Amino acid sequence: MTLVMGPAALQAQTDVAASLYGSFRGTSNGNGTAESPSNPAGVMLEMRHISNPLVGYELNYSFNRSDEEYKGSVSTPQICTPNCVPAGNTVYQAVKANAHRVGADWFVSLSHLPVKPFALAGVGLLFISPDGGQSDVRGNTKPVFEYGAGVDWTVIPHLGLRFQYRGDLYHSPDLAKAFSSTNRFANTAKPMIGAYFRF
């Protein structure tokens, strides 16, 4: 048994990483509402463990602003004043918010190469919290499917750079109470660059 387990044990690796990213998502339209997000920068923290030459798991946390703009016909106009602004035949409302996301992924990596390509997929939860001082808004909690790919580049032993692209798939946020939900799926693209330390 020792002879069988020994090579696998030698491949076990754990690393921690921090990355900066841009968050890009298009406008969602549905049920008479157009929901337009900002495209903010964010930060992600990761912990990865790989226990054999190919497969491992990851836990991650990310934060970015999640300001939203809503435009359309309101279902209850009386609660839209003074938060909504007339825009032609429709009304407009901006909501300022923070987004926190936690996730868990499986990933496949060619960990024995100097430049290590990887691919990942997993699930998480997205918590969107409007800033204080705004009325007629609500927080959202959304389940998320995450996918991505990238490369780790070893600079010196135990330290390297991580270049990756990630996507988050989830239902579009509905933070403004006066507007109907678009009831659409949103896909957020996140190109990232970061650094890792491998134990």
Q: Positions of the model-derived regions?
A:
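Transmembrane beta-strand segments that form the barrel wall of outer-membrane beta-barrel proteins
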Residues: 16-26, 30, 123-127, 168
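Outer-membrane beta-barrel translocator domains and adjoining extracellular loop/strand segments
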Residues: 28-34, 69-76, 129-137, 173-180
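Surface-exposed strand-loop-strand hairpins of Gram-negative outer-membrane beta-barrel proteins
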Residues: 23-44, 140-142
